[in-house]
């Protein structure tokens, strides 16, 4: 059975009462193999000691407090790893934005949509902002039509996140990357590139008459 320790100037990010630090008369114990049971704290501590693990109070405000039978060091390690993985994901995933106008022409639409598609394939969320200048705000329908075109174009790699929303003279449309769609998109793209790289077939002369010798 362990006591909470710190090394040097490091402090644990999460602190739990464990073992002898748990002073309440009874606790609800969650077992590693599943299931739970309310028992006297001293019995729960004894059980933890017999198993060579720790009694960890994870929900002190519950009635009675909830404790887990687990190795304290492993629990902290798992929580730190989960926190690091979350931070890593937050760093690699960012929001990319491109602006459109309700009368955006086809060339500009295709060019910008290709960039949005690239951002999504790299795992980024994207926001398409449709800006209404001057009196063009009276043509809100064009903005929603453009949002639908964007949704259709990006549907091979993403899903639209909610409905388009107006804020002032701007219409915001959000898209979330879809892992499965992206994998399928990449497979189809690789196949198309492979086919395009194949040498052309020789001409079929089977139907032409043979020359007389």
Swiss-Prot record:
Cytoplasm in keyword set: yes
Cellular localization per UniProt: Cytoplasm
Record-level Gene Ontology MF annotations: ribosome binding; translation initiation factor activity
InterPro entries: T_IF-3_C_sf, T_IF-3_N_sf, Translation_initiation_fac_3, Translation_initiation_fac_3_C, Translation_initiation_fac_3_N
GO terms (BP aspect): ribosome disassembly
HAMAP family the record matches: IF_3
PANTHER family linked: TRANSLATION INITIATION FACTOR IF-3 (PTHR10938), TRANSLATION INITIATION FACTOR IF-3, MITOCHONDRIAL (PTHR10938:SF0)
Protein name listed in UniProt: Translation initiation factor IF-3
